Amino acid sequence: MKLLHERMMHSLARYPRQTAVVDEQDALSYEALELRIREFVAMLCALGVGQGQRILLWAHKSVDLVAVMQAALRLGVVYVPVDPLSPVSRLEKIAGDSQAVLVLCTAARLEELAGSALAQVRSVVLDDPASAGYWRNIDTGSSVVPTLAIQPDDLAYILYTSGSTGVPKGVALSHGNALAFVDWACERYCFQPGERFANHAPLHFDLSVLDIYCALNVGATVCLVPESIAFSPRLLTDFIRQHEISIWYSVPSVLMMMMQDGDLLSDIQDTLRVLLFAGEPFPVKHLRDLRAAYADVRLANLFGPTETNVCTAFEVGAIDPERVLPVPIGTAASGNQVWAQKPDGSRCAVGEEGELVVQGPTVMLGYFAKPAQEGPYKTGDMVRQRPDGNYEYLGRRDDMLKVRGNRIERGEVEAALLAHPQVSEAAVLVVGEGMNAQLWGVLVAHTRDALSLIDLKRHCAQRLPRYMIIDKVLCLDALPRNANGKVDRFALARQVEG
């Protein structure tokens, strides 16, 4: 079984009545999920969507969305999940880059689509039976499911990340890329039939790959955390209890929020067996508290960019009371090889700082519509190997930022700010850590008229997803620059923090 959808079908044969997926309103067994998948397969065939074509998923999490993903995989159709709260302008960029032939959306977004460059792209509504575009209103009587030859190296899905030119980049991932990680994770963490995974991460975020595909791989249940409670700490803790969650995977800032404001440390969730985190460093003082409160729970730090999924992992045991640095990112994972590399291409010795390089089965096919990824992937992450073999994360080599676990290309936010008619120059930086991290825009205006933060936020909301919208603004007469003419970001940080 070398294809993603074959794993769900294997679980169907073994555990047909086991609950497969749960959302706010529905719960489907593997049998019921299979029937729903077949309905969506018929729908896609009726619409003429064929192998290798791309479809956009611009809708909130639901059992139907999971079924659409599976249906697409069976037909060799490439699905592209998009933040359901993204402005239509971002969807236009992604649709243009991916050359999508279909948009699956909520009824509430139809009007925006009609007034956009996507008006000529077929749209299907997932959530409103009263809508003329509702998926079940499509005539599937004459649809024929083709016989297909799908290979492990075929493209399965595309995850769009922030792009340095202001245009999102599509990370193209194959069945084999995903399954190399899924198989490793299932074996490493001993996932079992009947366990219950919480899917906290949005479906356009690579953390969701573990939640969805590991669960369906082993005959477990994936419980979709509604977007409406994704940042409500007490409700998240309640979600764990109500759904008897055994596997939790999220960014550290969400866990810290639950610890500080959701009673996760005092209201012990005894169904938890595995706690996984990724996406940003976990401040050790908070991680130490979590480790102490959940002494019998398996706790691990997973690391890797979207381009490689998880390429290293570290098991968190007892934490030295004197430790102040974050725990390591660990050693190679998912069948990959990793090493630290110097600028001249030579490998670093133990203790030397270098760029993390990854080679192996989870490395992406490439960026969609760009040249294929050849050879090892340079992550842009600076690391150092310790004598015990574990790697420590030291920061980014380039201009990538992380805010509350979200990866943000500085240039995309700056490009959006510069599109404002009153902005002459723009620089972006992050101040603070974890849930306290804030994205600052430092601006130079064309005129002396004051720039309104509310106006800037509204302006950015038309161009960027919400996690990329600035939290604070500082206006200067000129941006500080160093001797070579580049913006002096150290001086910027001093001005913002001062």
Curated annotation (Swiss-Prot):
Reaction(s) this enzyme catalyzes, per UniProt? holo-[peptidyl-carrier protein] + L-proline + ATP = L-prolyl-[peptidyl-carrier protein] + AMP + diphosphate
Q: What EC number(s) has UniProt assigned to this enzyme?
A: 6.2.1.53
Is Ligase one of the keywords?
yes
Output one GO BP term: secondary metabolite biosynthetic process
Q: Name one GO molecular function term.
A: ligase activity
Q: Which Gene3D superfamilies match?
A: 3.30.300.30, N-terminal domain of ligase-like (3.40.50.12780)
Give the main EC class. ligase
Q: Supply the PROSITE patterns for this chain.
A: AMP_BINDING
Q: Does the keyword ATP-binding apply?
A: yes
What task does this protein carry out? Involved in the biosynthesis of pyoluteorin. Catalyzes the conversion of L-proline to L-prolyl-AMP and the transfer of the L-prolyl group to acyl carrier protein PltL.
Q: What is this protein called?
A: L-proline--[L-prolyl-carrier protein] ligase
Q: What is the lineage of its organism?
A: Bacteria, Pseudomonadati, Pseudomonadota, Gammaproteobacteria, Pseudomonadales
